[in-house]
Every structure is written in C-alpha cells, then in structure tokens.
Amino acid sequence: MNKFKGNKVVLIGNGAVGSSYAFSLVNQSIVDELVIIDLDTEKVRGDVMDLKHATPYSPTTVRVKAGEYSDCHDADLVVICAGAAQKPGETRLDLVSKNLKIFKSIVGEVMASKFDGIFLVATNPVDILAYATWKFSGLPKERVIGSGTILDSARFRLLLSEAFDVAPRSVDAQIIGEHGDTELPVWSHANIAGQPLKTLLEQRPEGKAQIEQIFVQTRDAAYDIIQAKGATYYGVAMGLARITEAIFRNEDAVLTVSALLEGEYEEEDVYIGVPAVINRNGIRNVVEIPLNDEEQSKFAHSAKTLKDIMAEAEELK
C-alpha cells in the first residue's frame, strides 16, 4: 500500500502551459507529488518520463506520474490548464461556450472523485472559467482561484523596473480587472520604496508618453508573443507555480488572482483579477485598494464586460 503523504497536485491539461507549469513545480520542488491528466496519454507518458529524469537535480524528490480523475480524491490542489484554443473567425463567445462545456465535464469528473481541495484555473477566458468552476463544483469561493492578472502584473512590474533600473521585486504595482483587453493599471498606488511611480514618470520630459507606452506594452504583450512564437506559456506557468507555492507554504502572500467579489470594489457575483491574500486555505480575503474615480470607472467597465459575456452563456444559466 502506498502510504506516501505530502503536497499533491493534479494537473489537468498537458499542453504548452500545463507542461511548463509541471516543469516549474519539479524545478523548484514546490510539490511532493504531481499527477498529470490529459487526453493525449502518449504525450503525458513522455513528459512524465522526462520530468522524472529531471528530479535528481531538483532540490527535493518530486514523485511524478500519469493519472486519471480518481487520483483527485486526495489531491490538495487541482490545476486546470485544459481547454479549446480560439480559432480564426471564432468569436469570443464561441470560445467561452466551448470551454464551459469542457469545464462542466472536467469539474464533474473531479468532484465525483470526492475531491475536497483547492481548484486553480488557468484556461482562458480565465475569469469566466474560474466562475464556472466555482458554480459547477459547489466548493466555497475561497477554494476556487483563477490565475487572473498575476501575469499582467508581472509584466507591468518588469517594464517599470526597466524604466527605473531596479529589480522587478522592488516594484509594488498591480494590474487589475479582466485578464484581457479591459484590464487596468492601478497607477494611483504604484510605487518604489513609497515613491509614486506616476509622479516620477511625469517629471521626465517624455514621461506622459512613457506612462501610456508601459501600460500598452503590458496589455498587448501576449499578442506580440503569440505573433512571434504562437503562444505564451513560460510566464503564466511561473505565475501558477508562485500561486501554488503561496498555498503550500501557507504564506499569506498578496497576489493578483481572479477571485469572487461580494461587494468589494463595488461589484458582486463576478470573478475578476484583484489582489488577494493566498494561503493554505486558498483565498483568505480580497485586498481592496482605494481606487481613484477614473480607476473605479474602468474597473466597473471591466466587470460589466465579464458579466455581459456570462449572461449570454447558456451553460451558466
């Protein structure tokens, strides 16, 4: 009988994002056991072998195996990276509908295993699919997390760090809202060591143009990467690994994830990217940044965009 007990992750979806996330977990020894599920069982078999061969060089031993939905019964975390990609000529609503059907099946299979852990959702549109996972699973909102704007915030901090020649970790700045075109930067609270970044940028000759350029580069980064190499996966995989680390180490770390709002930011019944405290129980609480009027208006527009799409989705009615 296998009596092994440690932090266990089940990864559902072994595409570019999923496999990159799996490598990040093994590379950093964030988990004790990793189970991978995908329809392409032969690719899973190959990746499991490849990852196992990497474990002698990871900080601690990580057990990696191919699995099935029954393996979710004692998992601490189920991470969903599976889903359909948007095809040429396909509308966003078409993609939403297709992925909602996929998620209904996946979440149903996971819950049938008697799973009682935390869901982490990465598939796009992530805010809508995190909401769907919460609805389909019946789990408390604290135990369903979307990757949200964790990658957008990382891109934002990177560009700001380059503008000021400091380490990205020294920049305190967030992108909130939909993980998509309606996201927004919280300039009113962005700072380095307490110094407001927008004020510092505005003091430069080309500062105002640079402010707009930094946000546009942040928002449109995915399009540039997709044009160059077909997809984005390393950045989001590292973001997922960071969320996983915060959960398993019970960090109470503040990360910009997709969380359910129940009055915070003047919004209700929507999963959307906001700062939240992450620990072993999932989302401890949403952190409410005092937004200025312009930011609040943009955030409301972002939330409405998500709600309008969900209102048209038959699978959520």
Swiss-Prot record:
InterPro entries: L-lactate/malate_DH, L-lactate_DH, L-lactate_DH_AS, Lactate/malate_DH_C, Lactate/malate_DH_N, Lactate_DH/Glyco_Ohase_4_C, NAD(P)-bd_dom_sf
Organism superkingdom: Bacteria
EC number(s) reported in the record: 1.1.1.27
Induction statement: By nitrosative stress and anaerobiosis. Expression is not detected during aerobic growth.
Family to which this protein belongs: Belongs to the LDH/MDH superfamily. LDH family.
HAMAP family: Lactate_dehydrog (MF_00488)
Full protein name: L-lactate dehydrogenase 1
Gene transcribed to yield this protein: ldh1
